[in-house]
């Protein structure tokens, strides 16, 4: 009887700690190669924005992204010849916020080629939309003490 109770507790814990099905489905959809086509703001004006403590919006637009969900890694390449080009590596996590609305947080942490972070700093974005051919991230930052939203629109290149 005691062994049966222990087995039941282990089974319940295993199922309770598993990744939600919707997050698993998101990982399948995000897998592959994407292009960051457009970056916009929820306010009008001219802004000097540096994304992921790396480079400007102008340099980031047109970049190529690869997501490898089975080990939560990826990379992006800056393609604009007027910018510091090259491949950047990252690790990522998709966290479900609300199953009813389908909202997710997307956590991205820049790393070196070996998957190690020099600063251990990461970025939390809202995965506002994810479909078979398009994806949108939203990042809310503070500008003059008020919320300022950055929208990043991706299109899928290939799986």
Predicted regions, residues:
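Contiguous, well-ordered beta-strand patches that form the walls/edges
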Residues: 40-42, 62-130
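C-terminal motif of bacterial Sec signal peptides marking the signal peptidase cleavage site
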Residues: 13-16
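Positively charged n-region of N-terminal signal peptides that target proteins for export
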Residues: 1-4
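Extracellular beta-rich ligand/substrate-recognition surface
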Residues: 54-57, 115
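Sec-dependent N-terminal signal peptides
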Residues: 6-9
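Flexible, solvent-exposed loop segments that connect beta-strands
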Residues: 41-55
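N-terminal helix-cap/turn-to-beta initiation motif at the start of protein domains
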Residues: 18-35
